[in-house]
Each structure stands twice: as structure tokens, then as C-alpha cells.
Amino acid sequence: MIIEEQVVLVDQQGRALGLQEKMQAHRDGALHLAFSVLLYRETTQGIEFLMQQRALGKYHSGGLWTNTCCSHPRQGETLEQAGLRRLTEEMGIVGLESLDDIASFVYRAELDNQLIEHEWDHVLIANGTELAIIPNSEEVKSYRWWSKADLELGLADTPELFTAWFPQVLQYVINELSSQ
């Protein structure tokens, strides 16, 4: 039996309205709850961010670079629980105990395959120093740690290599880390 994945629909204030099948929500462009996790580490050269290149077989944005992982919380699941679950499912990361919810924003982007991302996206962060990474090849084509400078240069020179939501996620994380 195939279990339908559902997303939590929200209003413009982020309040839950109900559920909709995930692919239908993306065809309709329905506003729904999502999260983007970005792990960072401090090195002698500065802060680095753990990025993944989405697997080519993903239902959208395959092959593009993005934050460590992203998805949608299930009904009754907190954003932190969902973020930790997807870190394990996508990146094979276990042992991280918590994520900080630092910001949220709404974005709408028309994607490939006639899909529309319209999300109330929460930005979740944690220090990812010394975590073992064993990516799931169905989710992740590649991964690497990027410096802030390399990311800013990549976004300026080749924005088409990154997902639609990533520039906003990165800006919120940079602002948060520079205020600490």
C-alpha cells in the first residue's frame, strides 16, 4: 500500500488550515508549511555551510545546490522533529539533538515540471561540526562544505545552479550568525 504524503496548508499568518496531498499542493501552488535546515561549522578560515546537490531524480529542482536538507513537517510533527528526521533520511546524519528555528518567510516560485513552490518556510540551523555524513543517493547527488564567500560568489555568478529558496535561507542564517 502506498501512503500519500501530505503537506500542512497554512494561511498568510502561518496558521494551519488543513492537509493536502503533496504533489497536488505543488501543482495548485497552495501555501504550505515547510522547513530548510542549514548546518554550519566554524573553521580557522571562517564559517562553512553544509550544502547538498539535489539528486537528479527529485520531483523538482534536481541537480541544483541547496541547504543541508529541506522538506515538510507531517501532521502532528514539530518543525524540529521533522528537520531532524530529514537530516537522517537525506544526509544520514544522526546524533544531532536540536535545531534552532531562527526565521520564517513566504516565497512562491514556478519550478520545472509545471510545479509551484509556495511555502511558509522556517529556517532551522545547528552547528554541524564533527557529524558523520552518509547521504542517501535517492535524495542527494553530492554534498560539500562551502565557505560564505564561495556561496556569495556562486549566487552572484551562477544563481541558476541553486534552488529558488536558498538565497533567502542563506541570508537569514548569515544575519543570525553575525549577530551572535
From Swiss-Prot:
PROSITE patterns: NUDIX (PS51462). Residues 30-168 form the Nudix hydrolase domain. Its main location: cytoplasm. The active site is at residues 70, 119. It is an enzyme of class 5 (isomerase). Its EC number is 5.3.3.2. One of its GO terms (biological process) is isopentenyl diphosphate biosynthetic process. It is found in: Cytoplasm. Keywords: Cytoplasm, Isomerase, Isoprene biosynthesis, Magnesium, Manganese, Metal-binding. The keyword Manganese applies. SUPFAM superfamilies: Nudix (SSF55811). One of its GO terms (molecular function) is isopentenyl-diphosphate delta-isomerase activity. GO terms for cellular component: cytoplasm. It catalyses: isopentenyl diphosphate = dimethylallyl diphosphate. Mg(2+) binds at residues 70, 90. Belongs to the IPP isomerase type 1 family. PANTHER family: ISOPENTENYL-DIPHOSPHATE DELTA-ISOMERASE (PTHR10885:SF0). This is Isopentenyl-diphosphate Delta-isomerase. It comes from Photobacterium profundum (strain SS9).
